Structures are given as structure tokens and as C-alpha cells.
């Protein structure tokens, strides 16, 4: 599963990838990320929402493919 996450994250636009990594890997809050990057907190939230939706969709698709192939 980590390989799938890494693949999806690597395909993200640079700013979204950076925000995701600062949040999930470095553990920074949305406020800290916004301050560090000089952007609005809402922008950080939007990027994280999109990133998590992309990861969720990729995981759902991989589970579906696995289930279809295992029948």
C-alpha cells in the first residue's frame, strides 16, 4: 500500500505534494504550513482535501481491481 501512496503523491503537482508531505510526514499544522509557504490556511486545506481524495480514489480502484482479479 505504501508503494501506491508514493506513486500517487509523486504524481501530484509540486505545491500539493509539498503541502501533503509537510502535513503528513513532517506533522505540521495547516496554520504552520500556510505560514511557512506564505499562503492562506484555506489554500492548504484545499490542497490537502484534493490530495486525500486522490489517495482515496487510488486505493478504492486498487481494491476493486484486486477483487475482480481474485474472482
What are these regions (language model features)?
Residues 52-71:
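C-terminal edge and immediately downstream basic/flexible tail or linker adjoining helix-turn-helix-like DNA-binding
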Residues 10, 14, 18, 26-43:
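Helix-turn-helix DNA-binding module
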Residues 4, 47-50:
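Residues within the DNA-recognition helix of helix-turn-helix
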Residues 2, 42-45:
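Short linear motifs centered on Gly/Pro in flexible linkers and helix caps
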Residues 10, 34, 50-53, 57:
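A generic signature of intrinsically disordered, low-complexity regions enriched in glycine/proline
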Residues 1-8:
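Short, Lys/Arg-enriched N-terminal segment that forms or immediately precedes the first helix
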